[in-house]
């Protein structure tokens, strides 16, 4: 029996079958040698005998075992009886059973303590890399871009109440809205805040930014971070100029930012409405830099944010959209069918939006009224509670008292709201008051929105609501991942990274040259995988290796996510949505 002391690491050295099978096990405080004969019982199980050696014998036994193993190594490759010990399979995993122990120049008896080593020479590794074959991925299924993706198990039959935001949830805007926001905010910046008139000549670039970025108000840098606050190399900009890795390290001292610094100076840009804001900040900084005009980054951020806020609150944006719905709103024929399906199964529906009733009413009539199939006269008949001007995220905190609003007279009641009436409109309110008045509580309520922090975090944490996020970009991202070219490039990158891991176990000039070649190739392949999503910042959901802050927050705060709300229509309302197993780095991945 092995020592009952905790074994911190086990290494097994198989010895050819023409000798006694000897397996050397390195333990944290002693060394155990297991010797086995080739005798097999009638049940087919080999019998083992073991004995312990004291720590005084450890060095001797290590040397003898390694030397004996090296002398017999050529025979092992020729002996079919030992095929079960190791069958080399390129690119499958880093750790293999040991056939040739690692040698350290300073200590020839040194055996690495972190994991087993390779059974091949450097020349064999180089040859294997040169002769690598394109991985056949034709049997690997693609993902449905319009599927519902699950973070946490969700039983739809337990949901009695479904709530919805308006912007980018029920209302799916076209790309022209981003151009409109940028132009209106730029006009405010120049006309009201007296920024240089020449800025108006710089137009919105829809290809520049992605959402989920962060702006450093201390240094004036727009960047993409992973969930560990690592800056993605090549995805950090001063104005429209990307910074090199050396420049980033000169500024921050590292590619990883401290949590305290992030909390103090980084401003998140988490929803689609932030895209024109990010572009406007970058264009403004670039213009001021090019013309040698001194500026404070924090002030630029405050002015641009204020200008974008004025666009949303001033009425100009909404009036423009209402004047041309076909240009700015994308109608989806399944939206009405999905909402009617919920109603037919006895579900309660509510609308919770920051927009005015005037704006939401015009949009909902355009989107829904021709999809009600004669079952309802107006979209307001479909929703049990309608709340506008709720002022999220303040709504989820202290909030304000609810007030009933009368659209016909543009008048607000002064009375306390102690129950919700059908076809009536309410403004203001708070999450606590909403729960008390509606009596809808906890996990029987599910709310859908497009903004993780403004829409979903607090209702989930404070009231236990189930949450769903609508991410418009998801269909494009999944479509790119499904493309044969992307999948082939990803497979090549994973192969390459496996070779890099193996190469690092060797030493010498030849190894260094080969490793440098591999790293250069890795850099090129990473760029090739980044550019299809966005040439500047890459994917919304991941950096080269890790999940982005956006994706990590999505996993923590959303039970499900999808590209549009009506994607749920194909799921029975009795379905249990079960997530895929989330593997940890040390776990075996079974596909």
UniProtKB/Swiss-Prot annotation:
Residues 38-50, 68-78 have a biased composition (Low complexity). Pfam families: 5_nucleotid (PF05761). The keyword Repressor does not apply. Binds 1 Mg(2+) ion per subunit. It comes from the Eukaryota. It comes from Dictyostelium discoideum. The lineage of its organism: Eukaryota, Amoebozoa, Evosea, Eumycetozoa, Dictyostelia. This is 5'-nucleotidase domain-containing protein DDB_G0275467. Its EC number is 3.1.3.-. The active site is at residues 165, 167. It is an enzyme of class 3 (hydrolase). Mg(2+) binds at residues 165, 167, 450. Belongs to the 5'(3')-deoxyribonucleotidase family. SUPFAM superfamilies: HAD-like (SSF56784). Residues 38-88 are annotated as: Disordered.
């Amino acid at each position: 029996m092995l020592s009952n002391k905790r074994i911190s690491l086990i290494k097994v050295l198989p010895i050819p079958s023409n000798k006694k099978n000897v397996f050397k096990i390195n333990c944290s405080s002693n060394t155990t040698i297991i010797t086995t004969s080739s005798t097999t019982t009638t049940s087919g199980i080999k019998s083992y005998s073991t004995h312990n050696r004291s720590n005084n014998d450890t060095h001797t036994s290590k040397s003898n075992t390694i030397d004996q193993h090296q002398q017999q190594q050529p025979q092992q490759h020729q002996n079919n009886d030992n095929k079960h010990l190791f069958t080399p399979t390129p690119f499958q995993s880093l750790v293999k059973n040991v056939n040739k122990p690692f040698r350290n120049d300073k200590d020839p008896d040194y055996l690495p303590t972190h994991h087993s080593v390779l059974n091949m020479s450097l020349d064999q590794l180089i040859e294997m890399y040169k002769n690598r074959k394109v991985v056949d991925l034709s049997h690997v299924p693609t993902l449905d871009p319009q599927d519902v993706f699950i973070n946490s198990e969700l039983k739809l039959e337990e949901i009695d109440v479904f709530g919805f935001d308006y912007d980018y949830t029920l209302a799916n805007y076209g790309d022209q809205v981003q151009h409109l926001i940028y132009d209106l905010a730029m006009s405010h910046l120049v006309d009201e805040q007296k920024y240089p008139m020449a800025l108006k000549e710089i137009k919105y670039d829809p290809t520049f930014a992605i959402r989920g970025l962060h702006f450093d108000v201390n240094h004036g840098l727009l960047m993409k971070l992973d969930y560990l606050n690592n800056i993605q190399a090549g995805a950090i900009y001063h104005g429209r100029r990307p910074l090199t890795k050396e420049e980033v390290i000169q500024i921050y001292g590292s590619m990883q930012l401290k949590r305290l610094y992030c909390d103090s100076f980084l401003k998140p840009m988490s929803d689609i409405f932030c895209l024109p804001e990010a572009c406007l900040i970058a264009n403004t900084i670039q213009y001021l830099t090019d013309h040698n005009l001194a500026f404070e980054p924090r002030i630029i951020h405050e002015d641009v944010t204020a200008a974008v806020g004025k666009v949303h609150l001033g009425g100009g944006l909404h009036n423009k959209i209402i004047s041309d719905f076909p240009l700015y709103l994308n109608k989806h024929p399944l939206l009405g069918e999905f909402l009617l399906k919920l109603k037919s199964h006895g579900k309660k529906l509510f609308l919770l939006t920051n927009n005015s009733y005037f704006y939401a009413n015009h949009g909902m009539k355009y989107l829904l009224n021709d999809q009600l199939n004669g079952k309802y006269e107006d979209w307001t008949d479909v929703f049990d509670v309608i709340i506008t001007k709720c002022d999220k995220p303040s709504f989820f905190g202290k909030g304000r008292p609810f007030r009933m609003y009368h659209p016909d007279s543009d008048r607000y009641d002064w009375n306390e709201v102690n129950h919700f009436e059908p076809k009536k409109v309410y403004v203001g309110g708070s999450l606590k008051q909403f729960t008390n008045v509606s009596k809808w509580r906890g996990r029987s309520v599910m709310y859908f929105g497009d903004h993780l922090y403004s829409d979903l975090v607090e209702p989930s944490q404070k009231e236990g609501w189930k949450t769903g996020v609508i991410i418009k970009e998801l269909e494009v991202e999944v479509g790119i991942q499904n493309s044969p070219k992307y999948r082939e490039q990803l497979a090549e990158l994973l192969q390459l990274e496996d070779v890099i891991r193996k190469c690092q176990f060797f030493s010498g000039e030849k190894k260094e040259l080969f490793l440098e070649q591999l790293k250069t190739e890795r850099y090129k392949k990473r760029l090739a995988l980044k550019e299809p999503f966005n040439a500047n910042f890459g994917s919304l959901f991941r950096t080269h290796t890790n999940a982005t802050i956006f994706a990590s927050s999505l996993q923590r705060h959303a039970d499900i996510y999808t590209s549009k709300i009506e994607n749920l229509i194909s799921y029975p309302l009795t379905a249990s949505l079960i997530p895929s197993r989330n593997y940890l780095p040390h776990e075996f991945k079974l596909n």
